[in-house]
């Protein structure tokens, strides 16, 4: 029997491709394709969906996640915009409900490897900044991938970065800061998704860069998340925990 999946945000570019991918996979049945005017909770009940893949917007992803969990389905969240306090609340709710879920800042396996390599490098390089770039339809900044990368680096590095007595002549010139790591966000036509993690040391730099040039690169990660989430009883933040 195929696993019943709802794709929420099915009319977007990622949503259309996710529907096509899951419909062509022998393990899954897409039982509903939802957009913003549809009732997510009622659709879960009507279709008896086991998984909801959320590919919507930053301004509604938290409420969508609560709805999915409270209606007994497993969330696979590919929408950025969740802050740490919201992730903590969703983690607690999944524990109470004993239901699995996945929040994936990035579904690209290459991007996950980039984050893992950057985490390893941070054990040896304490000076690091992140430059992320996306298309202009992505209205939240910085990206979920950049935030997650900063969190992973902060947890792994063995000494704090140098405190520089800099004065910003233009406010924001040094980017935003997350876990004491500067993040610079680009929004340009011609970009899909790009991230560079740039490390510096005396006499050298190390650059770890990943480029997504086609949304198809995210599909293996969506399939992997849908396969793994059925066996979880907790919320997992980051696809790297499933590799």
UniProtKB/Swiss-Prot annotation:
Fetch the Pfam families from UniProt: DapB_C, DapB_N
Question: Which reactions appear under catalytic activity for this entry?
Answer: (S)-2,3,4,5-tetrahydrodipicolinate + NAD(+) + H2O = (2S,4S)-4-hydroxy-2,3,4,5-tetrahydrodipicolinate + NADH + H(+); (S)-2,3,4,5-tetrahydrodipicolinate + NADP(+) + H2O = (2S,4S)-4-hydroxy-2,3,4,5-tetrahydrodipicolinate + NADPH + H(+)
Q: Where does NAD(+) bind?
A: 9-14, 78-80, 104-107
Q: Which domain of life is it from?
A: Bacteria
Enzyme Commission number(s): 1.17.1.8
Q: Which GO terms describe its biological process?
A: diaminopimelate biosynthetic process; lysine biosynthetic process via diaminopimelate
What is annotated as the active site? Answer: 134 (proton donor/acceptor), 138 (proton donor)
Q: Which UniProt keywords apply?
A: Amino-acid biosynthesis, Cytoplasm, Diaminopimelate biosynthesis, Lysine biosynthesis, NAD, NADP, Oxidoreductase
- Give the UniProt subcellular location, in the record's own words: Cytoplasm
Pathways per UniProt: Amino-acid biosynthesis; L-lysine biosynthesis via DAP pathway; (S)-tetrahydrodipicolinate from L-aspartate: step 4/4
Positions of (S)-2,3,4,5-tetrahydrodipicolinate binding? 135, 144-145
Which terms in the Gene Ontology molecular function aspect does this entry carry?
4-hydroxy-tetrahydrodipicolinate reductase; NAD binding; NADP binding; oxidoreductase activity, acting on CH or CH2 groups, NAD or NADP as acceptor
The record's Gene Ontology cellular component field reads: cytosol
Q: Can you tell me which family this protein belongs to?
A: Belongs to the DapB family.
Role according to the record: Catalyzes the conversion of 4-hydroxy-tetrahydrodipicolinate (HTPA) to tetrahydrodipicolinate.
Indicate what this protein is called per its UniProt record.
4-hydroxy-tetrahydrodipicolinate reductase
